[in-house]
C-alpha cells in the first residue's frame, strides 16, 4: 500500500543553492591572460605550478582572445580544471590611453577582465612569464583585501604587475565601474612597468606581499643565483626564456628550463613527487602516464586517488590494465580494496591474500578480508582474518574493529516474526559515532515505545542482503529503512546499490512487505558526488517499491527528486530526523530543572579537506577567539562524537595555548547522550547530530556549517541565523556575539527551540498516522 502525502503544513523548503553557497566554502581560482606568443611561457607556468605545489589544483581561468584549438588542447593536457574565457575588448574601446597593438598594453587591459569574474571568492593572477618555484599556501590562505608585491624600482606605493591575490569585495560591479571610469578618464600611466589603471584606482591601498612571491628577473642581473626562498620567479623585460633569453641571467633561465618538458616527462615528474598529490591532477596526469608506460606504482597511486573519491570501478580498471608482479603487495592490496568496493569479492580475496604475504601490508589486507567475510555473513571467517591482522600488528585499529564485530553475539530475538518490523540501519560499534549510535533506537521510537528485539528484527545496512535475509524480512510485518545519512557513496561502498544498504536489485524486488524509508538523509559533502548510474537505478527501484519514502530535510528531497523521473517526485516527502523531536518520543521525558553553566563545542574531522579547504588554520584561530570570548561568560567544554573529534582540543592547545575539557561522548549510551545535551545551555556543533540531538532535547544550538545538511536543517526550522560557516571571515566574532546573545536570552531561546520543534512534531505525527494505515494498525 502506498500513501500519498497529505496536505500537512511543513517547514519551507531549503533554498535551491549550490553546496558551496550553503557551506560558505571559498571558491579559489588562478587566472592569466594568454595569447599565442606567450603560450610557451604559460605551459611552463602550468607545469611549474603542479610540480612545486603538487597538492594544489584549483580552477585556472584562461583569459584569451585568439588561442587556436590546438593551443587549447595543449593547455588542457596539463591541467584538469581549465576554464576558458574570452576577453571582452568592448570594455576598453573608450579608454583614452594605450597602444591596442602593443602586447604589454593589451595584457594590462585584458587582465582587468579578472575583476569581472563572479564565480570565485579568491582569484590569484599569474603572468605567463612566471614560473612557480615554492609553496603558495600563504597566498591560498589569504582572506582579505587585494594583495600584491610592491614595485622594486619604482616606489612602494605601486604594485608590481603579474601577481595579484584578489578577494570577493574587489570582484564586484562597483570596483569594475571604478576601473572603467579611470580608463575612460585617461588619468593613469600605462607602460611596461606597472598596472596603470589598477594602480591609479588603488593609489597604494593594497596588502603588501613579500618580494619572493613576485621576484623579478632584473634583481638577478649579473647572473646571480635565484634565492632559495623564491616562490614565484618573474621574467620581466623584453627577452623571454623561450625566445632565447637574455645575457646576464643564465642561472635564472636555468630555473625556467626545469619546466620546459614534454607532456610525457611532465607526467612522469608529477607522479614521482612525494607527499600529497591532488586527486584531480593525479588522475589527469597519471592516467595517460600509466597507459603509456604500464608502470605499476603509478597505477597504484591513481587507483588510490579514485578510491578516495569514491570512483571504485575506475580504480579497478586502471590497476587491471597493468601487470602487477606477485611480490608487489601494495598494488595488490589497493586492487583488492577496489574490487571489494564493487562487490567482486572472490577476485578481491585473491588480491588481498597476495598482499597479506608482505609484513608491511598484511594487517590492512587481513582487515579487508575480515570485512568482506563479515559483509557476506561469515562471522567465523571474519574473526579468523581479523585475528590474523592483530597478530601481525597488535595496534591495528581496523583489525580490532572487525574482530569485535565478528565476535559479538547478536541479541536474541524475543518476539514472534509476525509481530516484528525489520529495520535496516547502520548499527554503530562501541566507541563509534555517538549520533549514529543513537539513531536506530530513535527511529524505532517513531513507531512505538518498544525499541527492543521483541518488536524489531535488526538488519545491518552494510551486510549483504542475500536470499536468507530476504526470507527473514518477508516473514515480518514490514521493513523500515532509516538511521542516518544512508545516501552516501563511500562510508561502506558496495557494487550492489552504491549506497550504504548493500542490497542487490533482485532482492529488493523480492521484498513483499511494506517498505518504509524513514528520515534518511542525502549526505554527500560539498565537492563529493554520486558518479555511478548504479546508485540512481537502485534509488529509483527503492522509491517505486516504497509505501512510504521520507527524507529528513528539504535539501535531501531536492537532491533525490533531481535523480528521479517526474512521476516519482510526489512519493518523496518530508520526515524530520526523529532525534529533532526526542522530547516528544522518549517516554516520560522531563526537561531538566537546572542546566549546567556550560557551552559544549564539537568539531568534525572526517573528510577534513572537503570540510575546510584551505581554511583550517583560519577556522582554528577564529575558534580560539570565540572560546576566549565565550569562556569569559560561560565554561566551554569539547564534546567528541567520535575519536577523531578530539583533535579540536589538541590543536587548540598546541596552536593557541587553550586547554579545554574533552567529553568522550562516543563512550556514552543513548540515555547519557540525551541527558548531557539536555543539561547544557548551548551546543556549538559541526556534526549534523551535534545540532539535531541537542535541538531535539530542547537545547539551543549554533551549527558550524561545513556540510550542506546543516544548512538544510536550519532552513527547515526557519532559523538560518543559528548557523555560521566554518569559512566565515569573522567566524570568531560572529560566533561569540551569537553565543552570548543566546546565553543572555536563554529562556526565550529555549522557548523558541520548543516552538520550532512543534512544527517538526506535527509533520511526524501526520506521517505516523499514514504509517499506521500502511501497517494495518
Name each model feature, range by range.
Residues 1-45, 55-56, 62-63, 70, ...:
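A glycosyltransferase accessory/donor-loop signature
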Residues 78-118:
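Active-site-proximal specificity loops/subdomain of glycosyltransferases
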Residues 132-159:
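Conserved donor-nucleotide/metal-binding helix-loop-beta segment in metal-dependent transferases, i.e.
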Residues 233, 404-777:
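Active-site anion-handling motifs in enzyme catalytic cores
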Residues 293-294, 326-327, 360, 394:
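Short coil turns that delineate tetratricopeptide repeat
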Amino acid at each position: 500500500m502506498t500513501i500519498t502525502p497529505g496536505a500537512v503544513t511543513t517547514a519551507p523548503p531549503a533554498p535551491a543553492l549550490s553546496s558551496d553557497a550553503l557551506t560558505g566554502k571559498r571558491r579559489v581560482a588562478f587566472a592569466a591572460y594568454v595569447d599565442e606568443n606567450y603560450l610557451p611561457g604559460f605551459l611552463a607556468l602550468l607545469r611549474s605550478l603542479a610540480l612545486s605545489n603538487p597538492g594544489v589544483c584549483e580552477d585556472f581561468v584562461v583569459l584569451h582572445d585568439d588561442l587556436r584549438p590546438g593551443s587549447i588542447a595543449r593547455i588542457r593536457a596539463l591541467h584538469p580544471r581549465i576554464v576558458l574565457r574570452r576577453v571582452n575588448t568592448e570594455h576598453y574601446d573608450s579608454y583614452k590611453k594605450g597602444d591596442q597593438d602593443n602586447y604589454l598594453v593589451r595584457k594590462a587591459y585584458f587582465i582587468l577582465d579578472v575583476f569581472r569574474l563572479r564565480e570565485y571568492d579568491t582569484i590569484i593572477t599569474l603572468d605567463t612569464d612566471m614560473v612557480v618555484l615554492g609553496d603558495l599556501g600563504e597566498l591560498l590562505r589569504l582572506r582579505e583585501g587585494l594583495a600584491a608585491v610592491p614595485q622594486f624600482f619604482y616606489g612602494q606605493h605601486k604594485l608590481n604587475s603579474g601577481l595579484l591575490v584578489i578577494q570577493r569585495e574587489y570582484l564586484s560591479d562597483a570596483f569594475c565601474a571604478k576601473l572603467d571610469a579611470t580608463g575612460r578618464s585617461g588619468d593613469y600611466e600605462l607602460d611596461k612597468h606597472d598596472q596603470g589603471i589598477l594602480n591609479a584606482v588603488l593609489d597604494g591601498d593594497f596588502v603588501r606581499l613579500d618580494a619572493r612571491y613576485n621576484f623579478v628577473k632584473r634583481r638577478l642581473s649579473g647572473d646571480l643565483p635565484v634565492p632559495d626562498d623564491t616562490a614565484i620567479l618573474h621574467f620581466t623585460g623584453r627577452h623571454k626564456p623561450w625566445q632565447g633569453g637574455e645575457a646576464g641571467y643564465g642561472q635564472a633561465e636555468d630555473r625556467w628550463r626545469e619546466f620546459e618538458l614534454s607532456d610525457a616527462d611532465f607526467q612522469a615528474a608529477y607522479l614521482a613527487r612525494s607527499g600529497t598529490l591532488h586527486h584531480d591532477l593525479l588522475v589527469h596526469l597519471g592516467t595517460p602516464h600509466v597507459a603509456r608506460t604500464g608502470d605499476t606504482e603509478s597505477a597504484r597511486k591513481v587507483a588510490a586517488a579514485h578510491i578516495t573519491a569514491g570512483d571504485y570501478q575506475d580504480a579497478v580498471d586502471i590497476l587491471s590494465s597493468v601487470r602487477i608482479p606477485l611480490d608487489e603487495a601494495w598494488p595488490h592490496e589497493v586492487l583488492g580494496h577496489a574490487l571489494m568496493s564493487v562487490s567482486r569479492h572472490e577476485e578481491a580475496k585473491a588480491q588481498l591474500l597476495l598482499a597479506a604475504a608482505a609484513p608491511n601490508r598484511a594487517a590492512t589486507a587481513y582487515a579487508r578480508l575480515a570485512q568482506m567475510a563479515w559483509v557476506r555473513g561469515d562471522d567465523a571467517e571474519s574473526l579468523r582474518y581479523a585475528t590474523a591482522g592483530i597478530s601481525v600488528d597488535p595496534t591495528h585499529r581496523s583489525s580490532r574493529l572487525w574482530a569485535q564485530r565478528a565476535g559479538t553475539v547478536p541479541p536474541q530475538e524475543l518476539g514472534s516474526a509476525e509481530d516484528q518490523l525489520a529495520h535496516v540501519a547502520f548499527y554503530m560499534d562501541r566507541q563509534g559515532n555517538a549520533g549514529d549510535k543513537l539513531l536506530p533506537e530513535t527511529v524505532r521510537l517513531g513507531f512505538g515505545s518498544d525499541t527492543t528485539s521483541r518488536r524489531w528484527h535488526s538488519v545491518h545496512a552494510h551486510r549483504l542482503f542475500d536470499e536468507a535475509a530476504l526470507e527473514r524480512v518477508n516473514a515480518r510485518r514490514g521493513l523500515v529503512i532509516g538511521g542516518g545519512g544512508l545516501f552516501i557513496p563511500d562510508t561502506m561502498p558496495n557494487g550492489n546499490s552504491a549506497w550504504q544498504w548493500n542490497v542487490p536489485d533482485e532482492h529488493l524486488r523480492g521484498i513483499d512487505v511494506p517498505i518504509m524509508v524513514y528520515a534518511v538523509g542525502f549526505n554527500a559533502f560539498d565537492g563529493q558526488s554520486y558518479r555511478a548510474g548504479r546508485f540512481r537505478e537502485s534509488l529509483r527501484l527503492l522509491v517505486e517499491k516504497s509505501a512510504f519514502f521520507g527524507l529528513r530535510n528539504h535539501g535531501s528531497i531536492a537532491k533525490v527528486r533531481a535523480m528521479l523521473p517526474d512521476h516519482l517526485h510526489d512519493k518523496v516527502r518530508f520526515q524530520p530526523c526523529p532525534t529533532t523531536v526526542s522530547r516528544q518520543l522518549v517516554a516520560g521525558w522531563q526537561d531538566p530543572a537546572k542546566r549546567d553553566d556550560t557551552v559544549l563545542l564539537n568539531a568534525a574531522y572526517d573528510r577534513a579537506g572537503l570540510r575546510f579547504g584551505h581554511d583550517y588554520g583560519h577556522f582554528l584561530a577564529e575558534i580560539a577567539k570565540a572560546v576566549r570570548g565565550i569562556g569569559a561568560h560561560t565554561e566551554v567544554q569539547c564534546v567528541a562524537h567520535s575519536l577523531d573529534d578530539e583533535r579540536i582540543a589538541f590543536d587548540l592547545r598546541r596552536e593557541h595555548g587553550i586547554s579545554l575539557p574533552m567529553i568522550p561522548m562516543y563512550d556514552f549510551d543513548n540515555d547519557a547522550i540525551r541527558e548531557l545535551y539536555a543539561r547544557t545551555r548551548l551546543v556549538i556543533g559541526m556534526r549534523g547530530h551535534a545540532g539535531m540531538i541537542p535541538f531535539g532535547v530542547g537545547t539551543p544550538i549554533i551549527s558550524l556549517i561545513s556540510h550542506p545538511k546543516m544548512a538544510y536543517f536550519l532552513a527547515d526550522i526557519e532559523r538560518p541565523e543559528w548557523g555560521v560557516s566554518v569559512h566565515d571571515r569573522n567566524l570568531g566574532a560572529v560566533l561569540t556575539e551569537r553565543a552570548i546573545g543566546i546565553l543572555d536570552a536563554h529562556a526565550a531561546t529555549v522557548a523558541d527551540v520548543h516552538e520550532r520543534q512543534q512544527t517538526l512534531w506535527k509533520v511526524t505525527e501526520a506521517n505516523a498516522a499514514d504509517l499506521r494505515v500502511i501497517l494495518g494498525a
